[in-house]
Design a protein with these regions (language model features):
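Surface-exposed, charged secondary-structure patches
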Residues: 41, 55-99
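Short beta-strand segments enriched in hydrophobic/aromatic residues
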Residues: 36-37, 91-93, 127-128
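A short gly/proline-enriched turn/hairpin at secondary-structure junctions
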Residues: 21, 35, 40-51, 61-68
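Hydrophobic pocket/interface hotspot
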Residues: 20, 32-33, 40, 52, ...
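Short, solvent-exposed loop/turn segments at secondary-structure boundaries
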Residues: 45-47, 98-102
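Short, low-complexity N-terminal intrinsically disordered segments enriched in polar/charged residues
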Residues: 1-39
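Short beta-strand edge/turn micro-motifs at domain boundaries
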Residues: 106-130
């Protein structure tokens, strides 16, 4: 497989983040889960690890049911080494409380990508804080 430069991966990660946000904001858990490697793990802030595509899809479905909206990933940095790449940045989203007031929240984000056999990239580990 051909080597990839950090600049090239930055473009890939920026595009993937925009498409991930679009799938999230459309409340499509199957489309969000499609961004993950078959053995991927989510490490949600303050919660247990979520491993495997079916569990990841259920996690996002449950989150959508809680009314989380307007997700956005802002990339700060990428690094790459052979078949793994790391994207560091910030995330933000919002939800409405019982009174209907919009509550914004966000935090730091770290995504580890694994290069796939077809040359594409999928998320292997996804961790965030609040």
């Amino acid at each position: 497989m051909q080597a990839i430069t950090p600049e090239a991966f930055r473009t890939i990660a920026k595009d993937a983040s925009a498409r991930w946000d679009a799938a999230f904001n459309a409340k499509q858990p199957d489309q969000v889960a499609a961004f993950y490697d078959a053995s991927a793990t989510l490490l949600p802030a303050g919660s247990a690890a979520v491993t495997g595509l079916a569990a990841i899809e259920r996690f996002w479905q449950d989150l959508f049911a809680q009314g989380v909206v307007d997700h956005r990933i802002d990339m700060d940095e990428v690094t790459i080494d052979a078949g793994l790449a790391v994207q560091r940045g910030k995330w933000s989203a919002a939800a409405h409380d019982a009174a209907g007031t919009r509550q914004a929240f966000g935090g730091n984000l770290l995504l580890v990508y694994r290069r796939q056999a077809d040359g594409g990239w999928k998320i292997l580990n996804h961790i965030w804080n609040l």
